Amino acid sequence: DSGGKFVIEEKFVGEEFSLMSFCDGKSLKHMPIVQDHKRAYEGDSGPNTGGMGTYTDSNHLLPFLNTDDVNEAKMINEATINALRDKYDDKYKGILYGGFMATRDGVKLIEYNARFGDPEAMNVLSLLKTDFIDICFGITNCELDKIQVQFKKQATVCKYTVPEGYPDNPIKGQSININNITNPDQLYYASVDIENGQLIESGSRTMAVVGMADTISEAEVFAEREVSSIIG
């Protein structure tokens, strides 16, 4: 309409990735880079979800990123924390979860969250070698710079199971059988209930499995095998 208002948005074309960092208000310790896949169906099709699966590589980069891309994302996270402290006197403590896109014009920041990503957290925390409690104390006491945060040099693939019809019209109340899972330590519960001692799907992402191996392809094979063994 003549005289109306409109918004111009810049379109970015590239590959998205996530960089999460532990923050104590002055120091940051970065976690491995993760890529999330949000489309509900095979072949990156269907509606968006909270995240159907994620992966990391053994070198803590991703196949489509180079070292300069990762360093640029780290610098953006660091600049954000420094600006909060220096300009607004806000020493942010916790998890800084940056959503980025690698484009032909460089790395672009898409969004921030003040929390772990789901499912990204399951990838990076599965790789964490340092005691998580020590990291938490380092954050609260502003002594994160004294802690050597280390991660295993392995690849991970995380896959979610979801109810039939998810996300638009999920069927609720279906029973779940996990007796065939071979590594329950890498099974993570999400939207499930218990009725009469039986696990029940409650409508959203149900549970996730993380596969760890030397390569992404090997980790994917393990995650797929475990997910396929869940009956429900």
Tell me what each language-model feature is.
Residues 21-23, 161-163, 211-213:
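Short beta-strand-to-loop capping motifs
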Residues 1-119:
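Internal nucleotide-binding/catalytic subdomain
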Residues 172-175, 220-227:
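Short amphipathic alpha-helices in soluble, non-transmembrane regions
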Residues 54, 205-213:
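Short, well-ordered beta-strand elements within core beta-sheets of diverse protein domains
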Residues 3-4, 84, 225-232:
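Short arginine-rich
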Residues 71-96, 113-184:
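Active-site "cap" helix and flanking loop/linker of ATP-utilizing ligase/carboxylase catalytic domains
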Residues 41-43, 146-148, 193-199:
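Short beta-strand/turn micro-motifs at beta-sheet edges
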Residues 171-208:
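Generic long, charged, amphipathic alpha-helical segments
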